[in-house]
Amino acid sequence: MVTATANNNKYYNMTPHGDKWTAEYGRIGSSCQRREYPISQWEKKYNEKIKKGYIDQSGLAQDLIQVEKGNTENSKYKKIENKSIADIVERLQQMARKAISDNYTISSNKVTQAMVEEAQNLLAELVDVSNTEKFNEILLNIFSVIPRKMKNVSDYLAKSNKDFSRIIADEQDLLDVMKGQVVQKQTEDSIDSDKEDHIPTTILDVMGLEFSECNNDDIVKIKASLSSCSNRFYSAWRVKNKRTSERFENFVVNEGIKNTKLLWHGSRNENWWSIINTGLVLKPTNAVITGKMFGYGIYYAPKAQKSLGYTSLEGAYWTGGNSNSAFMALMEVAYGKPYDVYSFNSKYYNFDYERLQSACPGANCLHAHAGNMLRNDEIIVYKEEQCTIRYLVELR
């Protein structure tokens, strides 16, 4: 059970064992206290906590998945032989783990797929909220679903509706990182259960990924696409997610797409391990995050400078980045037939695939052209299967 008010973020766990049960309680992010009770006091204590405003989350606590601060080079996995690839895979995981340990109480709390889904549903509810009090009420529920490290919860709440898009973006990023860790653990567990005699494989094999070093031709292509940002190029890797790549190739064939494009996508450092593993995912929150003018889609840029603003690099416009290194990806996107847009209309805020078809039957993407409304072109797709990662690029 958890309570999340403006000044509290407390939990109270009740664990039965025989004719007794143990209570673990405290403020989320601090050390817990323990006390043992006879089983006869279970009902009394439960009702007492419910009356005090605690929320029963036992329904979300089935099929528990512990998210631990692991090490990719433990005995569970075969060592990745290529040092460059082993290093980048470990770095990507470390950045994800740090984001979780900085924001969630993972040392003593467990995360389930049900918790992730509930938090995502609550985040989606925030999209349509205009009242600050209601916004904060839902936000507190999110904090209670997956407990967070907070000294004072009120510091994390919206002061006005001007804070909404920033908070939604931050919460979505954190949840995406957590989701990536849960998906990884589920994948590992399912593979382990299928193998009677465990044969060590690399983490890339387990996750269905392929990494390889870029050759000179790749680097020339990447730098040309970076254009004015090419001086920031540091390193790059060819990346293939077998699942999203197969899905993309099937989409291109089935839809008769004749032209695909390599386009840029930027994101914070801690997000990339999740993005590489799960692909870019359509989320209702995309429509309200600052800079997302064209609704419920996945956003790409032909010019690297545009995507750079969404990374962790110091001075990044949309994220307020402060890192001396950052990552972007060149994604292959099924461009097909575009719906060309040269001026903004408020109807685009609610765009999705159905509205795209209403505006331009047969269109595969919305291409927003630079001009009065934008400094740089943006290309938005409204189906997840329209894209897959091809290159991961590090910038400094």
Task: Identify the meaning behind each predicted range.
Residues 12, 17-37, 275-296, 324:
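N-terminal accessory/precursor segments of enzymes
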Residues 1-11, 16-22, 28-35, 40, ...:
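Intrinsically disordered, low-complexity terminal and linker regions
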Residues 231-310, 317, 323:
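Long, positively charged binding patches that form subdomain-scale interaction surfaces
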Residues 47-71, 282-375:
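ADP-ribosyltransferase catalytic core
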Residues 2, 17, 24-28, 267, ...:
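Structured beta-strand/turn binding interfaces of compact recognition modules in eukaryotic regulators
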Residues 19, 43, 269, 280, ...:
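Residue-level marker of positions within ordered structural domains that often coincide
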